[in-house]
Amino acid sequence: MLPVHTEVKPNPLQDANLCSRLFFWWLNPLFKAGHKRRLEEDDMFSVLPEDRSKHLGEELQGYWDKEVLRAKKDARKPSLTKAIVKCYWKSYLILGIFTLIEETTRVVQPIFLGKIIDYFEKYDSDDSAALHTAYGYAAVLSLCTLILAILHHLYFYHVQCAGMRIRVAMCHMIYRKALRLSNSAMGKTTTGQIVNLLSNDVNKFDQVTIFLHFLWAGPLQAIGVTILLWVEIGISCLAGLAILVILLPLQSCIGKLFSSLRSKTAAFTDARIRTMNEVITGMRIIKMYAWEKSFADLITNLRKKEISKILGSSYLRGMNMASFFIANKVILFVTFTTYVLLGNKITASHVFVAMTLYGAVRLTVTLFFPSAIERVSEAVVSVRRIKNFLLLDELPERKAQEPSDGKAIVHVQDFTAFWDKALDTPTLQGLSFTARPGELLAVVGPVGAGKSSLLSAVLGELPPTSGLVSVHGRIAYVSQQPWVFSGTVRSNILFGRKYEKERYEKVIKACALKKDFQLLEDGDRLVIGDRGARLSGGQKARVNLATAVYQDADIYLLDDPLSAVDAEVGKHLFQLCICQTLHEKITILVTHQLQYLKAASHILILKDGEMVQKGTYTEFLKSGVDFGSLLKKENEEAEPSPVPGTPTLRNRTFSEASIWSQQSSRPSLKDGVPDAQDAENTQAAQPEESRSEGRIGFKAYKNYFSAGASWFFIIFLVLLNLMGQVFYVLQDWWLSHWANRQGALNDTKNANGNVTGTLDLSWYLGIYTGLTAVTVLFGIARSLLVFYVLVNASQTLHNRMFESILKAPVLFFDRNPIGRILNRFSKDIGHMDDLLPLTFLDFIQTLLLVVSVIAVAAAVIPWILIPLVPLSIIFVVLRRYFLETSRDVKRLESTTRSPVFSHLSSSLQGLWTIRAYKAEERCQELFDAHQDLHSEAWFLFLTTSRWFAVRLDAICAVFVIVVAFGSLVLAKTLDAGQVGLALSYSLTLMGMFQWSVRQSAEVENMMISVERVIEYTDLEKEAPWECRKRPPPGWPHEGVIVFDNVNFTYSLDGPLVLKHLTALIKSREKVGIVGRTGAGKSSLISALFRLSEPEGKIWIDKILTTEIGLHDLRKKMSIIPQEPVLFTGTMRKNLDPFNEHSDEELWKALEEVQLKEAIEDLPGKMDTELAESGSNFSVGQRQLVCLARAILKKNRILIIDEATANVDPRTDELIQQKIREKFAQCTVLTIAHRLNTIIDSDKIMVLDSGRLREYDEPYVLLQNPESLFYKMVQQLGKGEAAALTETAKQVYFRRNYPDIAFSSPAVMSTSNGQPSALTIFETAL
């Protein structure tokens, strides 16, 4: 497995001094680098030792394990929260001290503001002592401001690090658990859900730690402020506080509603992402079946449900944001209305001290406190989901029992087990067998007999209900569907072992990979993507086998590895790899290829989970039991022993000498013809995930907003926002004006000594009330409308992206790993649904506030503009400097996140393999390495934003200091109201300004998600689904296919995989297509289905395929694909997604493929929901479902792509027989590795290196000893070749000379005087 990240820079924080830590100076070199060039992974600092994934995960896991034990003792449910608290409470509690100091400073600040305003109210130009005292107050005010600037960011940095630690530890635990899940537990969860835990749920820890301390700091601060307000304005302060108190339960109600909506949303999101995962995985099949519309409807419906919940929760959020915006105004309004009505006179110092005090407590009470409640309630939901996952059943730990006497053994006795306890019939019943070193145990039986389950029992994946399995020795396992992980081919084969050249070369040779490595562009250094996207099926199977052989285990469990390769390679693998390289091992081989049974030490026949027969090949022949009939029906002739009397290898009939002689002497396809690159799947290499550079363009914003609403509506929204802000400021200005008038009136009163008149209270109060009401209305309206537009935009863009994905050519899915495409649908759409609208609204509100603060300050004290100019310049330069680096850091964070998910989903796909090789530890290390890489990026993301914020707040602090001291210098020309307004406004600027700038950067960062989604909305499209030129209704009547000089490549820059192919396939002809792995067989089908556009012409019944719509073309051909795909949903949906058939037709189709009973046994019959990707059916059964689909479609052209590779001979025969009956009137093309399935075809097409080498009747080709087809048949061994030639001859004469009675001489071959179980097959089409 590849190292994740090569070079590591030491973390400068470890050696930083106190000043450097306070102001984040240690980051300066990084910013310099970011200013000069684009940052890469090598620029990131290594993770601090205490933040390493392994350390954090194991620490928390320890606490969780203790908690589980304690809960068991106390007979209660374990609590994950308890484990988290016990693990982290000390370090987190210390951070509370920061909160305490910071909030105290916030509360004390207004007192000094009041003293300065007081000085202006009692202004006396001769009193120098008062002036000096005022300067003292200004200094203390400035000091408070500086303390806040530094402390706030230190606190935030530390709590976010705490959040990161919990998240990383959780991910480590989730992955560790995923590797240990029992199979019954895997049934209860899906890959999608586990990925969702890792992509969404754990992120809640990052957010909850930030606000948690405010749960106690909020109420404390409120008490402090109340006391100060009481001193300042007496009992009327209670009126204002009453509003605050009313707001709290209102907000917690909103919070509760919000969290219930969130958990519903999460369920819908899970379902959508799960379905999306399957759609992307099965895209090739969906395209060939032309099922896009059905899946589009499915996803659209899921998305509609999800969006309705998201809109609901967004409106609640909108109300919350609005209440934050207007709370202050309402509180001040109520307070001063009460104050005035109680007969008090308004003064500037009262107004602005109260305003600032309320401002201090308002942030905490209306934002941090409710956020804490909301985040805690979200975190509780997430912790519950994670806890439920962590409590799922695990596989019992199996000790790898080393053989005591050095002898490996597999012993199974009376073994009975169920995959699903709900079903009445056990999966395996009463199995008993023993296998010892040097034995090859072959397991055969029809589809669904329990062959793979038998291997899983030996692996320990299927726990026994009764009976016993004892395994001594190390196991290697090769799964039926090959599993490879992202990395090079070599790292897949080594699978964590040391590279030993000699052993490696031997393994490569035994697994027939040598030739492939010469042809692959980078040999075994080729990097294969997710699910081995760049290897053909046969290559993947051989790489898997090579992995097993290289491990040098004692016991080999091989689940039908020979079915994915052609006969010649299969023979090579069997002789060289299974019989020779593994001859001293215990080998249990599940196979459908009966010709190899002769070499087996024992044969085990399974049917319906029970062992029908067990014995050696010769015993079966002697006793003539049922196996004989099974063989008669299905055996493809077993190879006769090379020379009687040659020394045998552990009684396998191939001797070493004969194998080597065969190797060197036989004329082979491999020697004869230079083989082209394995062109089947050498699509273009997996490109790096694109990281767009530089600014987010205006175009992205334009597309985003126009997706949400019409331009007319957007202009209206802008005006609404501006008007709201104007009224917001007017309300404060009116209060200041009122205080000034009142002050002037008092002064006159004092000067004259008699009352000259009072202010008209109703006039001032009336206007004040009006302004407040309008502010509230505008505040709420703009909040809700912004959310409406942005959620709508997310919905529109999701639909466009999904539509674009459905219309993208297959190449796109081969080039991009599932994780990368899914990331857009989960992470990026998640951002657009949830965080972007919230951040955007927040940004607009704070930006407008900042602008109004500066405007008011400048209107009152024009000279403020003088220091503003240099401060603004510094700010602009700083922001640009910061964004150069922060953008790169954010993108690095996104791109280092993908591998974490890819590694998880890849591990889940190869779970059995990983466990069989005991590679959990190694996978866990790799996962931790991926996590650490992501933590490096995340750590930089946190610290760089703090670096910027500290500097911004410093600019604001300078602004406050200038205003405070400046107003004292100009004391003569100012009155108290003006100073109060300017100073109190500039104090609110402190947190507000840096928050608005950070939110602007945040919006820009989140717009990357929008950009990534928009990038997928205009992918290259395949041809249109429907064209104006529609084929006639019953087309094709005949099913004649003409290839006219066809060249085919998967991508413009890729190699040609079909070259100058010209062929005519007549109506109702059955054509077999053969050739080595990678000869271009599957590409021929891709060209026919136009999965990529072919050059040259392909005609079907005189209609040029490139002239009609893709759906018109694809719907008219049926395909039984190589890898059968079922989708989550009902069996009915899987057979007939468009509801075009009646129940009766569906049951009839199922009956014809002998699945009716299996489906009737399900609890909901045809409406039973299938497990993810139909994993509750065996591969063979899934293949039969594909056949049922083809039967239902009743098309004139049927294509079979190695469909019977994974099924037993009986099912194979069933499929062949159904194809003969049902598709007699159709044109059938069959790609086959088993030559017996196509020997009775009308024609055989032999492809090699993308060229059509031979095309004629099988018998005609077999008459020419130089033909490739002849050589292929001869490689099966003399007897088998004779039998096939005989069949071909009969078919030939029956077809061409029907009048001549043709009887075949019995073919009888004896080996050692024993009649071999040789029969002629009436199989295939």
From Swiss-Prot:
Region (Disordered), start-end ranges: 658-691
Parts of the chain that traverse the membrane: 93-113, 136-156, 205-225, 227-247, 322-342, 351-371, 710-730, 761-781, 836-856, 858-878, 954-974, 977-997
Classification via Pfam families: ABC_membrane, ABC_tran
Membrane topology: Multi-pass membrane protein
SUPFAM superfamilies for the chain: ABC transporter transmembrane region, P-loop containing nucleoside triphosphate hydrolases
Cofactor list: Mg(2+)
Enzyme class: translocase
Protein name per the record: ATP-binding cassette subfamily C member 4
